[in-house]
Amino acid sequence: MVTALEVPADALIAKLAAYIKENIPEIRPPSWTKFAKTGCFREKPPQNPDWWYYRAASILRKLYKAGRPVGLSELRREYGGRKRRGVAPERVYKAPGNAIRRILQQLEQAQLVRKTREGRVLSPQGKALLDRMAFEILEELTKERPELVKYLPPLVRLKFLSRSGVT
């Protein structure tokens, strides 16, 4: 079966963000997200109005990739960046925890993430969602690039080959 690590990350995150926006009512951006920057190291707020959904999808993928409990501090470090301080040397800052924490809480309400003593882990529903999205992306990529058909599961591969007329 196709996993979320076997497809391009940008395609997975974009598709997952669109799915979250349309189908998961528990995940909604707070009103302050229109004005907030994603860190003190940024000069302006994000230009994409759907950045909340993209960040939620990205967090889901990071939890999937880790395969172990991940804490808020680790996610803050992952989303952190370097701040230009004028004449002073650049310095690395962590991302603010409020947005990440609220997204994790919303993902918990949607039952895509579970909270454990060591941190947050992906729930079976969350893992299934990411794997399903990865499978759909691989099917789309296979239509564009037929050489990727070898990565499809055997039954789907046969169906694809019979439909396309390739033997």
List where the protein language model places each region:
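Short, hydrophobic-biased segments on the C-terminal half of alpha helices
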Residues: 72, 101-105
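Short acidic, hydrophobic short linear motifs in intrinsically disordered regions
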Residues: 69-91
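Short alpha-helical segments that sit at the start of domains
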Residues: 27-77
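Eukaryotic partner-binding/assembly regions in large regulatory complexes
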Residues: 1-42, 46
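A short, conserved structural fragment
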Residues: 104-118
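Short conserved catalytic/interaction loops centered on acidic-Pro-aromatic/His motifs
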Residues: 86-90, 114-120
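Basic, low-complexity intrinsically disordered segments
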Residues: 98
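Short, amphipathic alpha-helical interaction segments positioned at domain boundaries
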Residues: 124-167
